[in-house]
Amino acid sequence: MEKQYLTVTALTRYIKTKIEYDPHLQSVWLKGEISNFKYHSRGHMYFTLKDENARIAAVMFAGHNRNIKFRPENGMKVLVKGKISVYEASGSYQIYIQDMQPDGIGNLHLAYEQLKVRLEEEGLFSQVYKKIIPPYAKTIGVITSPTGAAIRDIITTIKRRYPIGNVIVFPVLVQGESAAPSIVQAIRTANEMGDIDVLIVGRGGGSIEELWAFNEEVVAREIFTSEIPIISAVGHETDFTIADFVADLRAPTPTAAAELAVPNTIELQEKVLQRTLRLQRAMRERVHKKEEKLQVLQKSYAFRYPRQVYEQKEEQLDRALEQLVLAKERYIDKKVNQLKQLSFYLEKHHPSQKIIQTKTAIETLQKQLQREMQTLLQTKEFVFVRAAQKLEVLSPLKVMMRGYGLVYDEEKQVLKSVKDVSLGDAVSVQLQDGILDCSVSSIEERELNNGK
């Protein structure tokens, strides 16, 4: 029988088909620890599930992982549901996860704690960014369910405490998948209106699932970026949501939020009355002090003898005028003297005088320079003539005119002794009117007169 060889692709696809048709492998529940976690830019998650003895590659596509509330991390123990298949390119089997829950802790509770830690590290809970709630808000925006008890409590409280306050309700969903986007859009709409002084965002109490919209990151960030101060009013006193931490002020209940948003009219009236009484008392005291001061002035010398006071002041004015005239004259005299001194100094140091003096000095120096140059020229001319005369006396040409000549060897070196040549050497004799080329045919050596 002839052997049939399979391709790697064919074998891999066969194994994949076997696995995918196995009902036990198409609905698998696993628990394990996450490692090598990677979050792809397209939203897919890739990681490894492991226990003490084995590991398996895991994939969770974006369509499934967008439904989980917490953030998977390396080292986290999880419970997953999925199916087993083969990744043909590597020939490895892996689990394709459809659902994932944290092992040992609630899904929502873990997501809550993770988001709380992350936003706190970013500074969204810092008191530095908290906006001040206006003390006398004219327009109060309320973002909540239009049918719940919360809106009734808020409106009743505001109308009772502050009847002149204008309430604008932004109806939203407060639970379910669409609740968070609904709340975010309401906050944006309120900010775009531009005439709202404070916002109340909240709902009545409930379970963590029912309150979850106020734990969503998008809601928290929208509250943080709101230009309008926000009071959170979610649940009851024991319920804390992420929105409570980010809001500018947290109220334990919707009723308490309304009380924090507006003042009490009765308390305001009492304050106005107290301030009116305090102002009246201050005015009476001020008038009394002014009356006492007026009485003192009326008893003063100026009020009793105004004519004498006028004459005294008139005399003082005359003396002051005389002193002013004298001071003016002294000042003018002083300035005239200063002007004369400056004029004399200017005339003495006028540039024209300096120019004349400098011009005279230059002319004197020019004449002196010409004399010295003439003297120097004559001296140099005399020295030159004497040197020329000496040079002429010592010139070899003068000696040659008396019958002498200069003898050179073949290398044009002057011969000074018969010892410098040999028989047959070619020599040149320079006379005053030309050169003789000669050959040495005999040498006769003579003694010098000095015996050398």
Curated annotation (Swiss-Prot):
Q: Which GO terms describe its molecular function?
A: exodeoxyribonuclease VII activity; nucleic acid binding
Compartments in which it is found: Cytoplasm
Give the main localization category. Answer: cytoplasm
Q: Name one Pfam family in it.
A: tRNA_anti_2
The biological processes this protein is annotated with in GO are:
DNA catabolic process
The answer to whether keyword Nuclease applies is yes
**Which controlled-vocabulary keywords does the entry list?**
Cytoplasm, Exonuclease, Hydrolase, Nuclease
- Which reaction is recorded as catalysed by this protein? Exonucleolytic cleavage in either 5'- to 3'- or 3'- to 5'-direction to yield nucleoside 5'-phosphates
- The catalytic activity of this protein is classed by the Enzyme Commission as 3.1.11.6
Single GO cellular component term: cytoplasm
Q: Which InterPro entries match?
A: Exonuc_VII_L, Exonuc_VII_lsu_C, OB-fold_nuc-bd_dom
Q: What class of enzyme is it?
A: hydrolase
Is Hydrolase tagged as a keyword? yes
Q: Which CDD domains match?
A: ExoVII_LU_OBF (cd04489)
Q: What does this protein do?
A: Bidirectionally degrades single-stranded DNA into large acid-insoluble oligonucleotides, which are then degraded further into small acid-soluble oligonucleotides.
Oligomer status and interactors: Heterooligomer composed of large and small subunits.
Q: Which family does it belong to?
A: Belongs to the XseA family.
HAMAP family hit by this protein = Exonuc_7_L
Name of the protein this chain belongs to: Exodeoxyribonuclease 7 large subunit
Q: Which organism is it from?
A: Bacillus mycoides (strain KBAB4)
